[in-house]
Amino acid sequence: MAGTGSFHPVHEIEDFLERKPEALQDIVFELRNLVAEIAPCATEAIRRGGLSYYDAERGGTVKGGICQIEVHADHVRLAFNHGAFIDDPRGLLVGERLYKRYVRLESYESAPWEALAELVCTAAGYDPASAGTTGSP
């Protein structure tokens, strides 16, 4: 990730989250800060269900995907499109989709921040074009 990232101004994220519970907003902002610290060259996209981060040099939100912050009614998910292929030594990732995996976060206090940082770091370095995601996980 040698390019320059693109993150939305904070007020746009605040507007996006304005109707979400404050406890979930805190989780989203902490995850966003984590991504910005680990992958400052990432591009941030505001999507209907949350925020998406990707390496624009590798592709869009799927091919170049790093992670997504999905905001649900009572929790936040830190999701990885290529989660089935990234190292998860603590076994945090769950999900039934072919490749996508996520970590469900219900409170700021119970979130495993160090482990989440490790997952984001691993995902930021994962390139599906060189690793091959055509087989089974």
Give the ranges of each region predicted by the language model:
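Charge-dense, helix-prone N-terminal extensions
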Residues: 1-137
